[in-house]
């Protein structure tokens, strides 16, 4: 059976390493090339022994021709590479934010750089399969969603599309420390992060315009007012988002749950739960668990959603997008369930 060739540009970050782990056991693809400038010349399995079956050399540049190239570079660093990859006939999935926003001016405002290839922003497909499956299938370039936006958007889209809520929402989200990347900072080292919870980037987080952009599409072009407050919590993986929105009219708890169940009934990686979900349910999986509930006294909808920020929030969703682009079963390579404890 033919195996599709894949490569990872910058394998050494958490998202790149998670990609390597998932792709190694994928039955229909072969991981052929991985890059990482600081570790070039070493073997992936030597530097990261837990990837013991991956004896690939880490190189400075992608070697050979691949069918799908995954970009796992930090924001601003990968966009300029994309035109050359596309010219070589490769399909590209970018895990950074470089192609998520459609308005090039937003990159200057939120990321502090002028986009090097704004002409590709319109072509890039926002890679949230539950909403963009048909567009992803034919795409050359997919912008993998951010971790916070994945959790928040999946939690709120059914309510916006069903016209259940006013066009505004408050999103309180809590993330494990891996969401801040592998480069250590004062706020992520053990002695600072352990037994501590803190909010950060209140009202200024870079994922906010991404959330607004996609919820706007779900609410028939009405630009929603989104208040987004992220927090760091002392765990390695996981995001739990709690979203609050005012109901347009009275609705029962069961009616809302049925709307959500129907919206996601055919989605292999979204489960509407009967009880509030835990982040540990998602650990190492591509699942998103969602719990909608009505606060009847205050006429509010509350939606809790949780994901593994490195899987459904990054590498797993990238592989899900790859499966769709290559015409493979969407769940291929992503069937793992969480471990307990």
UniProtKB/Swiss-Prot annotation:
Per the UniProt record, which EC number(s) apply here? Answer: 1.2.1.38
Q: In which pathway does it act?
A: Amino-acid biosynthesis; L-arginine biosynthesis; N(2)-acetyl-L-ornithine from L-glutamate: step 3/4
List, alphabetically, the GO terms of the cellular component aspect.
cytoplasm
PANTHER family referenced in this protein's UniProt entry, alphabetically: N-ACETYL-GAMMA-GLUTAMYL-PHOSPHATE REDUCTASE, CHLOROPLASTIC-RELATED, N-ACETYL-GAMMA-GLUTAMYL-PHOSPHATE REDUCTASE, CHLOROPLASTIC-RELATED-RELATED
| Record GO terms (molecular function) | N-acetyl-gamma-glutamyl-phosphate reductase activity; NAD binding; NADP+ binding
| Alphabetized UniProt keyword annotations | Amino-acid biosynthesis, Arginine biosynthesis, Cytoplasm, NADP, Oxidoreductase
State the protein's purpose.
Answer: Catalyzes the NADPH-dependent reduction of N-acetyl-5-glutamyl phosphate to yield N-acetyl-L-glutamate 5-semialdehyde.
Q: Which GO terms describe its biological process?
A: L-arginine biosynthetic process
Task: List the disulfide bonds in this chain.
Answer: none
Q: Which InterPro entries match?
A: AGPR_AS (IPR023013), AGPR_type-1 (IPR000706), NAD(P)-bd_dom_sf (IPR036291), NAGSA_dehydrogenase (IPR050085), Semialdehyde_DH_NAD-bd (IPR000534)
Catalytic activity as recorded in UniProt? N-acetyl-L-glutamate 5-semialdehyde + phosphate + NADP(+) = N-acetyl-L-glutamyl 5-phosphate + NADPH + H(+)
Instruction: State where it is primarily located.
Output: cytoplasm
Residues at the catalytic site: 147
Query: What protein family is recorded?
Result: Belongs to the NAGSA dehydrogenase family. Type 1 subfamily.
Q: Name one Pfam family in it.
A: Semialdhyde_dhC_1
Name of this protein: N-acetyl-gamma-glutamyl-phosphate reductase
Cross-referenced HAMAP family, in alphabetical order?
ArgC_type1
* Native organism: Dehalococcoides mccartyi (strain CBDB1)
User: Which subcellular locations apply to this protein?
Assistant: Cytoplasm
């Amino acid at each position: 059976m033919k195996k599709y060739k894949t490569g990872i540009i910058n394998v050494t970050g958490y998202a790149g390493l998670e990609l390597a782990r998932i792709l190694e056991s994928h039955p229909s693809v072969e991981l052929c090339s991985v890059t990482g400038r600081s570790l070039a010349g070493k073997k992936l399995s030597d530097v990261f022994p837990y990837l013991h079956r991956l004896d690939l050399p880490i190189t400075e540049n992608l070697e050979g021709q691949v069918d799908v190239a995954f970009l796992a570079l930090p924001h601003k660093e990968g966009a300029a590479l994309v035109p050359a990859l596309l010219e070589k006939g490769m399909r590209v999935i970018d895990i950074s934010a470089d192609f998520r926003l459609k308005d090039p001016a937003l990159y200057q405002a939120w990321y502090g750089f002028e986009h090097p290839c704004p002409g590709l922003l319109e072509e890039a497909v926002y890679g949230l399969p539950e909403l963009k499956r048909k567009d992803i299938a034919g795409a050359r370039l997919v912008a993998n969603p951010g971790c916070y936006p994945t959790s928040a958007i999946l939690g709120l889209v059914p309510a916006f599309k069903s016209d259940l809520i006013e066009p505004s929402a408050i999103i309180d989200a809590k993330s494990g420390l891996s969401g801040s990347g592998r480069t250590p900072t004062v706020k992520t080292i053990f002695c600072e992060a352990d037994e501590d919870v803190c909010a950060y980037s209140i009202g200024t987080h870079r994922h906010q315009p991404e959330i607004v952009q996609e919820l706007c599409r779900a609410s028939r072009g009405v630009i929603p007012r989104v208040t987004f407050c992220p927090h760091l919590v002392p765990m390695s993986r996981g995001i739990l988002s709690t979203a609050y929105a005012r109901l347009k009219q009275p609705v029962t708890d069961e009616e809302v749950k049925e709307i959500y169940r129907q919206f996601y009934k055919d989605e292999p990686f979204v489960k509407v739960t009967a009880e509030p979900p835990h982040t540990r349910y998602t650990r190492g999986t591509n699942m998103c668990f969602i719990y909608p509930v009505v606060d009847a006294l205050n006429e509010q909808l509350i939606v809790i959603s949780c994901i593994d920020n490195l899987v459904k929030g990054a590498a797993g969703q990238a592989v899900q997008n790859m499966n769709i682009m290559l015409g493979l079963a969407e769940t291929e390579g992503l069937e793992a369930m969480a471990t307990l404890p």
